[in-house]
Amino acid sequence: MSRITDYAFLFQKSFGTSGVNAIGSFQLSQLNSSSVQSQLKAAGINTNSKQYKAAIKKMMSAGNGAMYGNIQGIKNLMSHYDKDGDYINPVNGLAGLLVTDENENSRKRIISIPDSSKEEMYELTKKEFLRENGVCNGDTTKRTDVYNNLYRKMSKKDRLAAGYTLEKYERIYRQAFYDAAKKADPNWKIGKPIKDGALDSVTRELAESGKSPAQATLDTKI
């Protein structure tokens, strides 16, 4: 889950000037000075908040102490984090979806997710499987909508694991549709027209029957 952020609006290179300049910008190295702290507090910024600390951490990682920032730039960056200091996804406005080195392994767990989300994924997977003749078309798929709908139903701490779980169910459904298409026409290959009615007997319950999401893999090159 890569993310590119332009911090040009936060920084300006300036050499041979004082720590706080005439237009209200200040060197990042001066953030903890009493004068800058007074400016921040006067602007309504809680410098003890996790939101502020997350923003400053990001600023410092993107620049260095000799670079400049300003009050509005800090406020703008703070708006990218929630009160717990967690990054807010700009696409869906939800926190708890940033994959880091710390949570990379812990997110890979199967948890209970709403049946409505599984049903939504089943229906979409079937629709797109038929429309694209089994091909995964990244240009036309609406998978992201299903995942975002799921994330809104989950608590922040469970969103990554919920997405991981739904991905496993998606694989189960695709495998079931592939197997059904092959059963209806043993000569069928991905990208070729699927025999009419080939998937009619594949219900969500049947696809999930006897399948463990934790072990879901694709046996085919779908």
Question: What is the role of each PLM region?
Answer:
Residues 1-222:
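Type III/flagellar secretion export determinants
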